[in-house]
């Protein structure tokens, strides 16, 4: 297995430890909150949460910011723009846009694990305009066209 090294910069507000994989087969690394004061996300509201890190991804890599399943299932806290995308040329602080879909206010404390980051390769494409597209069994069916039940 090839391990790609990615530069990470700890910013002045950094707290805790760098993101790391929890198990040998984890796809994502937990991101932690680096807010100076507790941030309350009221029910139905959105807050931008700092992480205290900036990264330099290699060309043709991206980082996706995804919800943590436990926060979502137990508290209704999820990533509003899931998945959020960090492009390879972005050098600013990684921040997480959290939304509270629950019924109760939720407080984000410094050091709390708030989201996960998955880093992956991607391909760039170029468009080739065409008047026709190859036929498939699915065709233009979408938005529930295959039904709800198996």
UniProtKB/Swiss-Prot annotation:
GO function terms (MF aspect): dUTP diphosphatase activity; magnesium ion binding
> Is ATP-binding tagged as a keyword?
no
Cofactor (UniProt): Mg(2+)
Alphabetical list of Pfam families matching this protein: dUTPase (PF00692)
Recorded hits in SUPFAM superfamilies, A to Z, give: dUTPase-like
GO BP annotations, alphabetical order: dUMP biosynthetic process; dUTP catabolic process
At the top of the EC hierarchy, this enzyme's class is: hydrolase
So what does this thing catalyse?
dUTP + H2O = dUMP + diphosphate + H(+)
Please verify whether the record's keywords include Hydrolase. Answer: yes
Pathway-wise, it operates in: Pyrimidine metabolism; dUMP biosynthesis; dUMP from dCTP (dUTP route): step 2/2
This entry's Enzyme Commission designation comes to 3.6.1.23
Q: Where does substrate bind?
A: 68-70, 81, 85-87, 95
InterPro entries in alphabetical order: dUTPase, dUTPase-like, dUTPase-like_sf, dUTPase_trimeric
Task: Name the family the entry cites.
Answer: Belongs to the dUTPase family.
Annotated function: This enzyme is involved in nucleotide metabolism: it produces dUMP, the immediate precursor of thymidine nucleotides and it decreases the intracellular concentration of dUTP so that uracil cannot be incorporated into DNA.
What is the protein name for this chain? Answer: Deoxyuridine 5'-triphosphate nucleotidohydrolase
Q: Which organism is it from?
A: Rickettsia bellii (strain OSU 85-389)
- In the UniProt record, the gene name given for this protein reads dut
């Amino acid at each position: 297995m090839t391990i790609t090294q990615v530069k990470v910069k700890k910013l002045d507000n950094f707290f805790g430890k760098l993101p790391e994989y929890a198990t040998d087969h984890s796809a994502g690394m937990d991101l932690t909150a680096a807010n100076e004061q507790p941030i309350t996300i009221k029910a139905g509201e959105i807050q931008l949460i700092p992480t205290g890190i900036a990264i330099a991804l290699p060309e043709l890599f991206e980082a996706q910011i995804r919800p943590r399943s436990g926060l979502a299932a137990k508290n209704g806290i999820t990533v509003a723009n899931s998945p959020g995308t960090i492009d390879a040329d972005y050098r600013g602080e990684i921040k997480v846009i959290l939304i509270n879909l629950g019924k109760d206010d939720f407080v984000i404390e410094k050091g709390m694990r708030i989201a996960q980051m998955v880093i992956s390769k991607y391909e760039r494409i170029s468009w080739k305009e065409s008047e026709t597209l190859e036929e498939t069994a699915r065709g233009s069916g979408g938005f529930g066209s295959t039904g709800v039940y198996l």
